[in-house]
Each structure stands twice: as structure tokens, then as C-alpha cells.
Design a protein with these regions (language model features):
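N-terminal Rossmann-like NAD(P)+-binding domain of SDR-like oxidoreductases, especially those catalyzing
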Residues: 1-168
């Protein structure tokens, strides 16, 4: 099994990569180190393929990393409220354009399985806990809105391009 993990040098991503390697997957990690650290992958760095890349800036080499991949785990993105208010374009580029680029590369490589790291922040301040997925969407900050838009892209690509996408 071959898996590609975006944001694989982050906390959640590096733990996922470690588990995938233990399960025998060949793993490609794409990360730009905006929040992750290569040191998070030290214990398995010889067992993975790592590419420093910004998913919001797609170039002609980008698609080659998706060749023969079975699963894409899209964990890359910016996550913080105050900086998203101060620089919403940076968050839009990372969380929306980056997700679009990942989906398009998956489509081009005929990858049918993608897992997307969503955010409960799209519900805003919940009216009740636990918050149901059927709750009203009410993003309060640019970060929450960009994660919601990314999730909508993932859902739409699943319907239109017959992909098996999961948003967590």
C-alpha cells in the first residue's frame, strides 16, 4: 500500500506516518514546515520519502508525487484564529487553494481515496454539546471559514469525480 500524507511533519501527521510505516505502507510526506518539524520524523526518516513543498503553490512537478498512490491523508493546513484574522489570504491559500490542488492531483492520478482533516470550528460557538454534524454552520473567523470551504471541496469532488473521500 502506498500512502501520501500532507502535513506529515506536524504532530498528528507524524504520528500517522509512523503508524502507516509500522503497517508496512510506503509513505510519501509533503510538508512545508510552516507548523511541522522534520525532527518529528527522525525515528522513521530512512523509511519514508519526504518532499518539502507548499501545497498552495502547485508546479509541474507536484503531480508526480501522487503517481501510484492508494490513499491520500490531507492534514496540511494553517490552524490558528488570531493569525487568520490578521492575514486571511494566507489561510485561504493554504486551506482552500492547497486543498483544491491536492484534489486536482488526486483526480489526475486517479486516486479514489482521500481523508481530509476538517475542523469543528466551522460550527462556530455551538448551541449545545456534543455538537452534531447536523448543527448550523456558523464560522466565526477566517480560519474556520477556510476549513469549511476545504471540506466542501472534498465533498464536492467525491460526488462529481466519484472519489471515496472522508472528512474527519
Amino acid at each position: 500500500m502506498k500512502s501520501l500524507v500532507t502535513g506529515g511533519a506536524g504532530f498528528i501527521g507524524s504520528n500517522l506516518v509512523e503508524k502507516l510505516v509500522k503497517l508496512g505502507h510506503k509513505v510519501i510526506v509533503l510538508d512545508n514546515f510552516s507548523t511541522g518539524r522534520l525532527s518529528n520524523l527522525n525515528s522513521i526518516k530512512d523509511k519514508i520519502e519526504f518532499k518539502k513543498i507548499d501545497i498552495s503553490k502547485k508546479n509541474k512537478l507536484f503531480d508526480k508525487y501522487f503517481k501510484d498512490v492508494d490513499w491520500v491523508f490531507h492534514l496540511a493546513g494553517l490552524a490558528d484564529i488570531i493569525p487568520s484574522i490578521e492575514n486571511p489570504k494566507k489561510y485561504f491559500d493554504s486551506n482552500v487553494i492547497g486543498t483544491f490542488n491536492i484534489l486536482e492531483s488526486c483526480k489526475k492520478a486517479n486516486i479514489k481515496k482521500l481523508i481530509y482533516a476538517a475542523s469543528a470550528s466551522c460550527y462556530g460557538i455551538p448551541e449545545k454539546y456534543p455538537t452534531s454534524e447536523n448543527s448550523r454552520i456558523s464560522p466565526q473567523y477566517p480560519y474556520a471559514l477556510t476549513k469549511f470551504l476545504g471540506e466542501q471541496l472534498v465533498i464536492h469532488w467525491a460526488k462529481v469525480y466519484n472519489m471515496f473521500n472522508i472528512s474527519l
